[in-house]
Swiss-Prot record:
Organism of origin: Escherichia coli O17:K52:H18 (strain UMN026 / ExPEC)
Function: Required for the expression of anaerobic nitric oxide (NO) reductase, acts as a transcriptional activator for at least the norVW operon. Activation also requires sigma-54.
GO molecular function: ATP binding; ATP hydrolysis activity; DNA binding; DNA-binding transcription factor activity
Gene3D superfamilies: 1.10.8.60, 3.30.450.40, Homeodomain-like (1.10.10.60), P-loop containing nucleotide triphosphate hydrolases (3.40.50.300)
TM helices/strands, residue ranges: none
Protein name: Anaerobic nitric oxide reductase transcription regulator NorR
Gene Ontology BP annotations: phosphorelay signal transduction system
Residue numbers carrying 4-aspartylphosphate: D57
SUPFAM superfamilies (alphabetical): GAF domain-like, Homeodomain-like, P-loop containing nucleoside triphosphate hydrolases
Pathway: Nitrogen metabolism; nitric oxide reduction
Length: 504
């Protein structure tokens, strides 16, 4: 089978459509699935010896949240090492990273797999993976044809990364190179709230402004602080953490500003405080609302004048510290109640950030669940950890009062429970492995199934045919909307409809 000029032109056109890179990437792999008639495809970005999914088609949504470290995925490592098309035989002993991650076929393993490494010059920047349930699914395509696909995808990804780098340098003063290399924090989520938060982090990171990060307990405020620091010019210097809620009043001033020998009973030597440790770097004050009014006054002086005094010392020390503060309280209300200084609040909240609760982040819960599943898989040495459809449905309908932290603990607990009740190193998380209170799931729609005098295959096809007809009618004959309603891939739906005689 050969690609026509029209097919290649169509792929190139799809890469130019859409507003953002994410939209273009999604269009690319959706088009590839239709052209190559594969069951699943993914575009991955390579960074720090791991592949990060940018867009997927035909795979479970939680794949977007997973991070595929080369050490734990030998097929992806083989793709990263190769300089050309990689075809894995159907009987390959190397586990496929997407086994169990094709919706509706969690118990089946992928049989055909092709990997296309993507390069910018001599540098590996990503990969395209194509998967199928039939062993010979990609035999009709030559390596040369697949190289053309890889070249188009590599060009699109390279341009996107270049634009991202240029935008980052435009926001940052001076040369961005020294601190770009230390970026490690991963903010997982594609919801509007998280997308906006990521943009605001990029903007404020370039400055030296103090930042007040507000959000409920467990939303990831510390992660936001790390992301700000790692994207800032101060990233080559330390990020120092202090939990104000766990700070006894008797030692709080010493922890912040340090002390000299003999300043109080037990002060047997000079000791630097957190501000000194963070000099030329960043100090993250978690739960800032727990500080006493007396300490708030001393903190305000540091923010105003940039000098500190160790406990027991008359001399002042100059420090250059950026302060990031976090709270789960409404500090405006605390100011009105007289429990927080208004002048300190205004000093800290030069650029306020709000971290949305998990219940307002939509499908991000599934992406995060995928990330935690992959973390558990690596930690416990499992070959795969998969979320069943029932588990995904449960996670999407629970409101998570403990936010991301509660989700993380729930996934870890569920993996341990599922592992205990299943032999082998493959774990499928079911709804019963989670212990959420008072979760109300939408009732399944009742459907009258007529008794028919047919064999099993004919009865199954009749049911599929009627189900698709009803879904099309409800969605005004929009095939994409119909596929979403039936929770299947639109390309697979088209093929099934043709086989059932619903399409020419």
């Amino acid at each position: 089978m050969s690609f026509s000029v029209d097919v290649l032109a169509n792929i190139a056109i799809e890469l130019q459509r859409g507003i953002g890179h994410q939209d273009r990437f999604q269009r690319l792999i959706t088009t590839l699935r239709q052209v190559l008639e594969c069951d699943a495809s993914a575009l991955l970005r390579y960074d720090s010896r791991q592949f990060i999914p940018l867009a997927i088609d035909g795979l479970a949504k939680d794949v977007l949240g997973r991070r595929f470290a080369l050490e734990g995925h030998p097929r992806l490592e083989a793709i990263a090492r190769a300089g050309d098309v990689v075809r894995f035989p159907a009987d390959s002993e190397l586990p496929d990273p997407y086994d169990g991650l094709i919706p509706g076929q969690e118990s089946l393993k992928v049989h055909a797999c092709v990997g296309l490494p993507l390069f910018a010059g001599q540098n590996l920047i990503g990969a395209l993976t194509l998967d199928g349930m039939q062993p010979d699914q990609f035999d009709v395509f030559s390596d040369e044809e697949l190289r053309l696909i890889a070249a188009l995808a590599a060009g699109a990804l390279s341009n996107a990364l270049l634009i991202e780098q240029l935008e980052s340098q435009n926001m940052l003063p001076g040369d961005a190179a020294p601190f770009e290399a230390v970026k490690q924090t991963q903010m997982i989520g594609l919801s509007p709230g998280m997308t906006q938060l990521k943009k605001e982090i990029e903007i404020v990171a370039a400055s030296d402004l103090n930042v007040l990060i507000s959000g409920e307990t467990g939303t990831g405020k510390e992660l936001v602080a790390k992301a700000i620091h790692e994207a800032s010019p101060r990233a080559v210097n330390p990020l120092v953490y202090l939990n104000c809620a766990a700070l006894p009043e008797s030692v709080a001033e010493s922890e912040l500003f340090g002390h000299v020998k003999g300043a109080f009973t037990g002060a047997i030597s000079n000791r630097s405080g957190k501000f000194e440790m963070a000099d030329n770097g960043t100090l993250f004050l978690d739960e800032i609302g727990e500080l006493s009014l007396a300490l708030q006054a001393k903190l305000l002086r540091v923010l105003q004048y940039g000098d500190i005094q160790r406990v027991g010392d008359d001399r002042s020390l100059r420090v250059d510290v950026r302060v990031l503060a976090a709270t789960n309280r409404d500090l405006r209300e605390e100011v009105l109640a007289g429990r927080f200084r208004a002048d300190l609040f205004h000093r800290l909240s030069v650029f306020p950030l709000s971290v949305p609760p998990l219940r307002e982040r939509g499908d991000d819960v599934i992406l995060l669940a995928g990330y935690f599943c992959e973390q558990c898989r690596l930690r416990l040495g499992l070959s795969r950890v998969v979320l069943s459809a029932g588990a995904r449905n449960l996670l999407q309908h629970y409101n998570f009062p403990g936010n991301v932290r509660e989700l993380e603990h729930a996934i870890h607990r569920a993996v341990v429970l599922a592992r205990a009740t299943r032999s082998g190193d493959e774990v499928i998380l079911e709804a019963q492995h989670f212990a959420f209170p008072d979760v109300t799931l939408p009732p399944p729609e009742a459907a009258a199934v007529p008794v028919v005098k047919q064999n099993l295959r004919e009865a199954t096809e009749a049911f599929q045919r009627e189900t698709i007809r009803q879904a099309l009618a409800q969605n005004h004959h929009n095939w994409a909307a119909c596929a979403r309603m039936l929770e299947t891939d639109v390309a697979n739906l088209h093929r099934l409809a043709k086989r059932l005689g619903l399409k020419d």
